[in-house]
C-alpha cells in the first residue's frame, strides 16, 4: 500500500452555525449521512454547541476526504456518500456508500481520518491509501 493522497480542511464553527441557522436545519440534512445525522441530533439535544461542533467536524471530514481522493466534491463524492463515525474507543473512521463505495473499492482505496475541534474551529486530516500499482498509475510512473 502507498499513499494515494492527503487532504486537510479547517472549518470555522461559527460559519457552520450561521449556515445551519439560515437554512433552518436543512444544512445538516444535506451534508450528514443517516448515522451522522442521528448522532448530530442526539448531541444537539444535549448541547447546542456540541451539536454544532459535531456538524463542523463532519463537514470538515468530507472536504478533507474529497481532497485526499482527488475528486473534490464531484460525483461520486457527495456529501451523504461519506460518513465519519466513531468506534467505541472514540477513534474516527470513514464509511462510504453507493457510487463512492464502488469507486473506492474498484481502486482498492482505504482511508485514515483524524478530526479535532476547539471552540472556534474544526480540523480534519485524511490519508488515502491504495495498492502500489494504483498509486503508480495515478502518478504516471511505470510499474
Swiss-Prot record:
Its cofactor is Mg(2+). GO terms for cellular component: cytoplasm. Keywords: Cytoplasm, Fatty acid biosynthesis, Fatty acid metabolism, Lipid biosynthesis, Lipid metabolism, Magnesium, Metal-binding, Transferase. It is an enzyme of class 2 (transferase). InterPro entries: 4-PPantetheinyl_Trfase_dom, 4-PPantetheinyl_Trfase_dom_sf, ACPS, Ppantetheine-prot_Trfase_dom. GO terms for biological process: fatty acid biosynthetic process. Its main location: cytoplasm. Pfam families: ACPS. It comes from the Bacteria. SUPFAM superfamilies: 4'-phosphopantetheinyl transferase (SSF56214). One of its GO terms (molecular function) is magnesium ion binding. Belongs to the P-Pant transferase superfamily. AcpS family. Transfers the 4'-phosphopantetheine moiety from coenzyme A to a Ser of acyl-carrier-protein. This is Holo-[acyl-carrier-protein] synthase.
Amino acid at each position: 500500500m502507498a499513499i494515494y493522497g492527503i487532504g486537510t480542511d479547517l472549518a470555522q464553527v461559527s460559519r457552520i452555525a450561521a449556515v445551519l441557522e439560515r437554512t433552518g436545519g436543512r444544512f445538516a440534512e444535506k451534508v450528514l449521512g443517516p448515522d451522522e445525522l442521528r448522532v448530530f441530533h442526539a448531541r444537539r439535544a444535549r448541547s447546542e454547541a456540541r451539536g454544532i461542533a459535531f456538524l463542523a467536524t463532519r463537514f470538515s471530514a468530507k472536504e478533507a476526504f474529497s481532497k485526499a481522493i482527488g475528486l473534490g466534491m464531484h460525483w461520486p463524492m457527495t456529501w451523504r456518500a461519506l460518513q465519519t463515525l466513531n468506534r467505541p474507543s472514540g477513534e474516527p473512521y470513514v464509511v462510504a456508500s453507493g457510487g463512492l463505495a464502488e469507486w473506492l473499492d474498484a481502486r482498492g482505496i482505504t482511508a485514515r481520518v483524524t478530526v479535532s475541534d476547539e471552540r472556534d474551529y474544526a480540523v480534519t486530516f485524511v490519508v488515502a491509501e491504495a495498492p502500489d500499482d494504483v498509486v503508480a498509475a495515478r502518478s504516471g510512473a511505470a510499474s
